[in-house]
């Protein structure tokens, strides 16, 4: 089974995952999440947590099509991203991290999604059956990443998966 962890940063899910990120950590095998080094229909699962927010809406469409290209017929794309429907109801504490400088070198969120908007861009990119997933019921639930991000007991991640 080929499982990709895109935009993984320092989070190492173990040897059964292929880690892809521009950062320099020992577990990272490839750097470019926009052009994956796989043939068509080779990958079973793609997972990314809080990665797509770094691309604007025009950039993300060809990227999603690339991810779809490498996924097998029954392949799954699993995405966690800041949930705009939740965050827009919150006041100042989350808005800085949402659109502000995130790290050194400076990287910034360029967009946020609600379920309807994310479903639309995924459908336009050829994905089907877009639905929320429970982050505690995945094969990566034991890893601390932003798919399980809570603020004042409210889950702030929009966690969706879809199929080819």
State where each predicted segment sits.
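Residues at the starts of beta-strands that form the adenosine-phosphate
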Residues: 2, 16, 129
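Conserved class I S-adenosyl-L-methionine
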Residues: 2-9
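Adenosine-cofactor binding site in Rossmann-like domains, unifying the SAM/SAH pocket
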Residues: 10-40, 134-135, 139-145, 150
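Local beta-strand N-terminus motif with an aromatic residue
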Residues: 43-44
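A conserved beta-strand element that flanks and buttresses the S-adenosyl-L-methionine
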Residues: 47
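Short catalytic micro-motifs in class I SAM-dependent methyltransferases
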Residues: 50-54
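S-adenosyl-L-methionine-dependent methyltransferase catalytic module, highlighting the catalytic core
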Residues: 57-66, 70-72, 76-164
